[in-house]
Amino acid sequence: MTEEKKIGIEFGIMVVRAGKVLLGKRNESPETADSELHGEGTWTMPSGKLEYGETFESGAKRELMEETGIELREFRVLCVNNDKNEHAHFVTLGFLAKKYFGEAQVKEPEEITEWRWFDLNKIPNNLYIPTAKILENYKQGKFYIEGLD
């Protein structure tokens, strides 16, 4: 009997300050990068999976605090995307942090090795696919874009 594949729900939180976006470098190791979509070594925005019984708000607050130490106070839903490859399939919600407090710190070094602010016009090429899609949604002002897999 084969295992039934399931679709997960994840989110990325776009934190912007003075025209720059916060991105973290995923660990190069597949064992520690914790990426079902296999984004080892790529740049990602703070992100995570929605846990059972959690609201979008509580999940976003939890993940941003766990990964960066930043307290999310207000956000809005920016976009929804369909992210899939041969390893996994997720519906990804993009959130835009509207109000937040604190400075980014490496809180989970086994997953994210550094946090860095990038100019929105000088984003690195090696982006985690869900992050690339959320940034493209933001730049184009679109809620959904098909075909960046």
Please describe what each predicted stretch is.
Residues 71-79:
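A short coil-to-beta-strand element that immediately follows conserved catalytic motifs
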Residues 81-104, 131, 137-139:
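Active-site-adjacent beta-strand/loop module that shapes the phosphate/pyrophosphate-binding cleft
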Residues 15, 94-98, 116-119:
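Short, well-ordered beta-strand micro-motif
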Residues 140-149:
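Acidic/histidine-enriched, glycine/proline-rich intrinsically disordered or flexible terminal extensions
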Residues 5-7, 39-41, 89-91:
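Residue-level preference for beta-strand/loop junctions
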Residues 1-23, 29-30, 46-49, 80, ...:
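Conserved N-terminal beta-strand and adjoining loop/helix that marks the start
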Residues 43, 106-139:
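NUDIX/MutT-family hydrolases
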Residues 20-66:
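Conserved Nudix-box catalytic region and its N-terminal flanking loop in Nudix hydrolases
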